Structures are given as structure tokens and as C-alpha cells.
Amino acid sequence: MFYKIAQKVMFQMDPERAHHLAIGSLKMTANSPLTCLYGQTIAPAPVSVMGLTFPNPVGLAAGMDKDGESIDAFHAMGFGHVEVGTVTPRPQPGNDLPRLFRLKPAKGIINRMGFNNKGVDNLVKNLIAKKTNIMVGVNIGKNKDTPVEQGKDDYLICMDKVYLHAAYIAVNISSPNTPGLRSLQYGDLLDELLSAIKTKQLELAEKHKKYVPIALKIAPDLTIEEIENIAQALIKNKFDGAIATNTTLTRDGVSGLANANESGGLSGKPLTELSTKVIKQLAICLKGQIPIIGVGGINSAEDALAKFDAGATMVQIYSGFIYQGPKLIKEIVNAYRLK
């Protein structure tokens, strides 16, 4: 009931203003009696992924809490994990406003945020300050003004700084809103990046006597051959996981709607089938050697089950969470327990 009221108010506001209000409110109320307004108890449904055991298979996707300001509040809602970020080595403002658009009739969202964040050092402070023991993945990216050819340096800087504070690290090379970023998904650039990241991971594991798994987040706008090439690179470089998928540049199912022609990545219900197809193809190519975290267009328990059936071991929600609220977490977990 509370979420429906809050949603009604926030949906009258500019989307980005509403987002900042939500994150700020959650930050203020976390670890206080006010968590009763949105907190809930979720039945245990443990799942093992990348050598880690999560209390349930439903996580919050990256992008909602970029700077890790409201982690404890999302823990109260019952998420099995939270993926913060995308974070970059240096703070950056992201792209020009407006850059976030609702497509309410389609339960979709278009964003061209551009990795706006307060920088990795600020994120680390927030990770240290969190009071709960929720699993936190850290999604890392490159700064906009870093040339693509030098992009791996930004990823390595972020890895170095977040390593001790992350349950796992997600390497984001699939956002459509940073010029040239998706080129890192192909050919020599991909192999060089994954090799450098794996080398760094092993160095940090030896230095800190702690192994932190690494996952690669990929786009939905890939051919079968491109998915096969990415899978081969993941296996070759012994990555621990894959996250599929990010937002899409396609506009299937939203033509004619207000805001549908805005540039940026489309998420939410219009992405459901495409992301599931990519998960299925990726699972075929990975042959069970690397687990997949499924994300993209999960708007119901049925959508989540389709991701599991396609080959995902765990799922994440974002746009569906905005449209459905915390109840979606419980619905997915309950359905997962029964499957």
C-alpha cells in the first residue's frame, strides 16, 4: 500500500528528480523504525553462484543505487544482493538533462544517464559505512573522457579500490550511453580487457588472500556469432560469471509511445523477450561452465522463471521494481521456491 502511494506521487514528478528523492529518502530511513514502511521478510531460498551463497536469487540491478547510498534500505526490502554502480575512477556528471524517460503504457524506461556517479573513492566510503551484511556487487566502468583503447586502465583502477569491499565485481562494457564502450565487447579489445582483468584479479587475490569473483555484463543487441565469441572469451579468461543483459537500443513494442524516440537504452517490459533469448543463447555457448545472472524486463514472477528456464542461476530487477515495487521480490522468491 505504501509503495503504491509513493509511486503515485513520484510518477507525477520528473523521473530523475523522483529517483534522487527515492534514494535520499531510503538513505535517511535505513536502519530506523521507518523501514517498516517498505521492509518485508523474505523466505530463505539460498542459491550458490560464482562460489558465493546468496540468501535468495533476486538482486537489485546496477543503476538504481549508483553510489551505494541506500544499500541497507534495499536489504530491508529483502533483496538477496545489491549491485551498486556503475562507478568510474573519477566523478563525472553524466550526459545532459533530460536523460531519463518513462514509457508507462509499456512499463518501460529509456535512459541515457552516461555513468553519472561520485567516483569510486566515494563509493568505497559508503561500502565501508553500510551496517548490514548484504551481498554487494560493484559494477565498474570507464570515464567518458578515457579513450576506449585505454579503457582497461579505468577498470583496473576501480578493481584495485573496491576489491576488499565487494562480494563480486561486474565489468560493464555494454552501456549504450558512453561513446565507444560497446566496442569493448568485440575482437582484440575484448580479449585484451578480459585478460588484463583476470591478471589483476589473481594479483589482488594473492595480495589480500581473498578471491573476489568477476562477472561480465553484456548487451542484448548481439548476433549469435557475437554471443559465441564473448562466451569463448569468458571461458578462455576463466571469468566467474556473466550478467545478461543491459539495456537495448531497439524500440520494439514501443513505437508511437511518448518518449519512444528518445535516444538511450530501453529497459523494462519491452526488453523481456530479447534479454531472455540472449540468456538462452549464452547458456548454450557457455555449456554450464560459467553461471549467468539474468536481467532485463523482469516484471513478474513468470518473467523471472523464464530467465531461470533459459539458463540463468540468479536474476536482477530494476525497471520492474520501479513499476511493481518491493512485492516483486517476494513474488519471484516464492515462485522460485516452488519450481
UniProtKB/Swiss-Prot annotation:
Which Enzyme Commission number(s) are on file for it? Answer: 1.3.5.2
Top-rank taxon, per record: Bacteria
Q: In which pathway does it act?
A: Pyrimidine metabolism; UMP biosynthesis via de novo pathway; orotate from (S)-dihydroorotate (quinone route): step 1/1
Give the organism the record lists.
Shewanella baltica (strain OS185)
Question: Can you tell me which residues form the catalytic site?
Answer: 175 (nucleophile)
What subcellular locations does the record give? Cell membrane
Quote the PROSITE patterns the UniProt record gives.
DHODEHASE_1, DHODEHASE_2
- What is the name of the protein in this document? Dihydroorotate dehydrogenase (quinone)
Q: Which GO terms describe its biological process?
A: 'de novo' pyrimidine nucleobase biosynthetic process; 'de novo' UMP biosynthetic process
- Keyword check for Cell membrane, yes or no: yes
Q: Which gene encodes it?
A: pyrD
